[in-house]
């Protein structure tokens, strides 16, 4: 018995054992063996919501008030190619990881019966069997695998260090932004991590406001213009001024492309996703999906694909693409995708991947569902037409390339009616679309 051996060798050494968040360990008595219980808790990541963490640890303390516990693992994954203004559970956006950790750290620290915690993990690391947004990499780190700090690293530093000033404009993970705008400027959120009492932020020489720092961060809506935007954050630490400077580089995409004129146009959409996705080889930004509105662009019909309940997209690795996260989401049951735009010659590119192929459940995914009985499981067949012109007949991505594999289809078309509309008609199962890009040739 390991516990008996430990106490015989060193009666003063405390013992611990780690479990995932399931009551089975209490029911069979395993959690009574060691001095300290270690719980690997990921509520708000693999499953449930943040408040489920509070309920779990508080109930543990209520039932076992004399048993100290540690949070032996907590964390959320992130991919710098994925950014979101509306982050959600398990989307691998940098913003959801920040929200997760901003909730967990104070929740842990304000409970004295939690005697320790380990954020999983300090640095992104190799993990051979992991799939998800960055295959074979566990991306829950506070630093990237090349040891560059993520912005959220400075939240931990601000929270835990009182001996030095911490002031960080949290834009390093998203310095190059493509924003959708109705005019020449657009407001975007900017966060500052700090252990100061107050911080003032300015942009391009214009002071915005002074914000109180709560939970080691504050946020601003910052007006950004095309090109370089210089941000300056300043505050007082022990009577001395502290300052940090950072830049954001912005490209604008007009919301109403029909009214924007007949200039150069390249517009890519991350269909079925709430995230901006930036191809780190081409620097092309695929914009979050949106419903169609006259004069603009967007989907008509359908719904977001969820491989497991409560999660957007799938965690399965998609082959035949370097842009795995772009293909891990889709819109299913889609009727059409429409762009209102100037007449001219365009290239249309559609991206597809059948995400219902069976994949082995991996042990680290504590909230996964092994299979999902969707109508389009490896068998969807549908027709695709553009502006009434038949294009793909009885098309099945699964039949052409197999499940969880990317296939791209391109077409050149002359637009003469002020809109480019891609229509989808189901033959068997459900229609779906993972990504769409249009490019004006002339």
Regions found by a protein language model. Give the residues of each.
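Short aromatic-centered micro-motifs
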Residues: 201, 235, 384, 388
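Aromatic sugar-binding surface patches on proteins
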Residues: 214-219, 403-407
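Surface-exposed, short loops/turns at beta-strand junctions within beta-sandwich domains
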Residues: 222-228, 414-416
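Short, exposed coil/turn segments at beta-strand boundaries within extracellular/luminal domains
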Residues: 237-245, 430
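Compositionally biased, intrinsically disordered or flexible polar/acidic segments
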Residues: 250-442
């Amino acid at each position: 018995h390991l516990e008996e051996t430990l106490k015989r060798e060193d009666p003063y050494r405390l013992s611990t054992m780690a479990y995932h968040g399931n009551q089975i360990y209490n029911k069979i008595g395993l959690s009574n063996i060691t001095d300290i219980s270690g719980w690997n808790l990921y509520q708000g990541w693999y499953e449930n919501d943040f408040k489920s963490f509070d309920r779990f640890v508080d109930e543990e303390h209520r039932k076992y008030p004399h048993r100290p516990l540690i949070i032996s693992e907590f964390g959320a994954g992130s991919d710098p190619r994925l950014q979101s203004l509306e982050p959600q559970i398990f989307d691998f956006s940098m913003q959801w990881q920040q929200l997760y950790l901003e909730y967990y750290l104070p929740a842990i620290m304000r409970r004295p019966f939690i005697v320790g915690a380990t954020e999983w993990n300090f640095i992104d690391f190799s993990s051979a069997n992991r799939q998800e947004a960055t295959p074979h990499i566990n991306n829950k780190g506070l630093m990237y695998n090349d040891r560059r700090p993520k912005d959220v690293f400075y939240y931990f530093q601000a929270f835990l260090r009182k001996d030095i000033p911490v002031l960080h404009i949290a834009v390093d993970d998203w310095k190059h932004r493509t924003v959708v705008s109705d005019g020449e400027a657009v407001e975007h959120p900017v966060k500052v991590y700090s252990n100061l009492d107050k911080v003032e932020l300015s942009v391009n020489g214009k002071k915005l406001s002074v914000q109180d720092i709560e939970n080691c961060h504050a946020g601003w809506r910052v007006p950004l213009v095309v090109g370089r935007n210089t941000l300056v954050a300043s505050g007082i630490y022990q009577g001395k001024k502290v300052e940090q400077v950072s830049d954001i580089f912005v490209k604008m995409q007009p919301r109403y492309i029909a009214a924007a004129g007949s200039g150069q146009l390249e517009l890519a959409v991350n269909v079925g996703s709430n995230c901006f996705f930036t191809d780190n080889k081409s620097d092309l930004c695929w914009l979050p999906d949106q419903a169609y509105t006259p004069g603009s662009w967007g989907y008509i019909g359908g719904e977001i694909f969820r491989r497991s309940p409560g999660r957007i997209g799938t965690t399965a690795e998609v082959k035949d693409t370097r842009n795995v996260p772009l293909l891990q989401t889709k819109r299913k049951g889609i009727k059409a995708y429409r762009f209102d735009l100037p007449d001219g010659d365009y290239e249309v590119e559609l991206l597809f991947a059948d995400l219902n192929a069976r994949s082995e459940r991996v042990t680290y995914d504590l909230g996964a569902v092994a299979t999902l009985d969707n109508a389009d499981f490896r068998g969807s067949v549908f027709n695709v037409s553009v502006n009434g012109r038949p294009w793909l007949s009885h098309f099945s991505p699964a039949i052409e390339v197999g499940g969880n594999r990317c296939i791209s289809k391109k077409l050149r078309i002359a637009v003469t009616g002020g809109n480019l509309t891609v229509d989808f008609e189901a033959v068997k199962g459900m229609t779906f679309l993972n990504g769409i890009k249009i490019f004006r040739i002339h």
